[in-house]
């Protein structure tokens, strides 16, 4: 389970450093924009953005849809305050809240979310809730992280536990779904809604970053507020982390630096007119 209060606190604390370290998230935002249909670009459509953060994707949406009314939601008040400084158009409403708890009153032509669905505790329920708020021919478009994310870290964490004889079920962070697992969750959520047929498309991509040191990688995670917000425990022994860092440096460093893999998933669910 994600501890939402802890998550909110971390995003609030690191809102001001988020943009400087969120390179992969920015890349994913552009990939989302590139997936959008050109049909709506000059129309007065309604858009709901979930997890707007500091407003990076919100700005891209404003440029792509000059006539759209945009509602952007984020859990963190610190993120919302920064987004308000970037996005000042009257047609954009910025709201602080948890989309899993908020009541959605209106319907939207587009519901879009970048690198946020991994923070949901009730993914099945939330996908169904959002899909119901789509207008006919509307789309739910989202990106999130897959189970190949931080594969180097997870491998070294497991090996470090073995070397030190630790047999706990702890992990260095939350677990992510594979493309197929998340696809099944979407279908299980939506198939019962027979009165609202859907079309689902999906894709995955690996993004690789390099850091000068393992510590620099850990710092980048902290600076975007995305350090472990699970309620599960993880090993914090100094001897364990020395072992972990040594394994990472020895096994995942090349001429470019320390390698970090992000597994990016993208889903587009369209409410068909059938």
From Swiss-Prot:
It is an enzyme of class 2 (transferase). GO terms for molecular function: carboxyl-O-methyltransferase activity; malonyl-CoA methyltransferase activity. Pathway: Cofactor biosynthesis; biotin biosynthesis. Keywords: Biotin biosynthesis, Methyltransferase, S-adenosyl-L-methionine, Transferase. It catalyses: malonyl-[ACP] + S-adenosyl-L-methionine = malonyl-[ACP] methyl ester + S-adenosyl-L-homocysteine. SUPFAM superfamilies: S-adenosyl-L-methionine-dependent methyltransferases. One of its GO terms (biological process) is methylation. Its EC number is 2.1.1.197. It comes from the Bacteria. Pfam families: Methyltransf_25 (PF13649). Belongs to the methyltransferase superfamily. HAMAP family: BioC. Converts the free carboxyl group of a malonyl-thioester to its methyl ester by transfer of a methyl group from S-adenosyl-L-methionine (SAM). It allows to synthesize pimeloyl-ACP via the fatty acid synthetic pathway. This is Malonyl-[acyl-carrier protein] O-methyltransferase. It comes from Priestia megaterium (strain DSM 319 / IMG 1521). The lineage of its organism: Bacteria, Bacillati, Bacillota, Bacilli, Bacillales. The gene is bioC.
């Amino acid at each position: 389970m994600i501890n939402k209060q802890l998550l909110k606190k971390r995003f609030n604390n690191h809102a001001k450093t988020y943009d400087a370290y969120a390179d992969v998230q920015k890349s994913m935002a552009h990939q989302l924009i590139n997936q959008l249909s050109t049909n709506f670009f000059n129309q007065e459509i309604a858009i709901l953005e979930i997890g707007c953060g500091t407003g990076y994707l919100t700005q891209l949406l404003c440029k792509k849809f000059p006539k759209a009314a945009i509602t952007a939601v984020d859990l963190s008040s610190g993120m919302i305050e920064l987004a308000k400084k970037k996005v000042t158009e009257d047609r954009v409403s910025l709201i602080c809240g948890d989309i899993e708890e908020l009541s959605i009153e209106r319907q939207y032509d587009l519901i879009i979310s970048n690198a946020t669905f991994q923070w949901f505790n009730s993914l099945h329920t939330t996908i169904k809730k959002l899909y119901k708020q789509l207008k006919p021919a509307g789309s739910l478009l989202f990106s999130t992280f897959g189970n190949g994310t931080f594969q180097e870290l997870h491998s070294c964490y497991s090996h470090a536990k073995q070397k030190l004889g630790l047999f706990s079920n702890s992990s260095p962070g939350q677990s992510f779904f594979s493309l197929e697992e998340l696809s099944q969750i979407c279908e299980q959520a939506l198939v019962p809604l027979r009165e609202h047929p859907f079309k689902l498309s999906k894709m995955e991509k690996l993004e690789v970053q390099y850091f000068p040191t393992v510590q620099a990688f850990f710092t980048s995670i902290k600076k975007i507020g995305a350090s472990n917000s699970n309620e599960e425990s993880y090993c914090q022994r100094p001897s364990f982390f020395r072992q972990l860092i040594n394994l990472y440096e020895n096994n995942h460093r090349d001429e470019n630096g320390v390698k970090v893999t992000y597994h990016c998933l993208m889903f587009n669910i369209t409410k068909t007119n059938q």
